Amino acid sequence: MSSSSSIKLQPWNDFIEWGRYSIPGSQNAITRMEDNLNFYSGNYIAIVAVVLLITLFTNMNLLVAILLLGAIGYYLFFVQKGDKNIGFAVLTPMIQMVILGVVSVIVIYKLSGLTLFYTTLVSLLFVLAHSALKMRNLKNKASNFVSGIKNDLKNELK
């Protein structure tokens, strides 16, 4: 069975449905997680984004720093593409990305302590726990199977 590559937001009442949770057997856990991560990917992205936005809006210094780092990244990688000559050194885009990443981690750590990292970690743990414990109903599995077949047919007809 092929999985759909598009990200769709599934209905929230189906996502939350309290009667559909159980602890999977060790053989079933990975399959259930893969299925749920594919099927509910839009919902998971929305949850992580909302939690991160709440964290950013409660810490204005961090929000300004993130926007500034994003603007610097945009300038480096989209406005002024290519190598940069700084004195005796040539900075390739990969080196620029590493430097920006290290500076970003340091700035975020200094401004938020570990709040942003903990927020991200808790969000991802929620996603993994939900994907492992949520049993999808037969209707959802059939819908996913049909969309996979449609995608396979589209790819073969191209």
UniProtKB/Swiss-Prot annotation:
Pfam families listed in its UniProt record: PRA1
Membrane topology: Multi-pass membrane protein
Keywords attached to this entry: Membrane, Transmembrane, Transmembrane helix
Annotated localization: Membrane
Main localization category: membrane
GO cellular component: Golgi apparatus; membrane
Cited InterPro entries: Prenylated_rab_accept_PRA1 (IPR004895)
Transmembrane segments: 36-58, 62-79, 88-108, 113-133
Family matches, as PANTHER family: PRA1 FAMILY PROTEIN 2, PRENYLATED RAB ACCEPTOR 1-RELATED
Function: May act as a general Rab protein regulator.
Similarity-based family: Belongs to the PRA1 family.
Protein name as annotated: PRA1 family protein 2
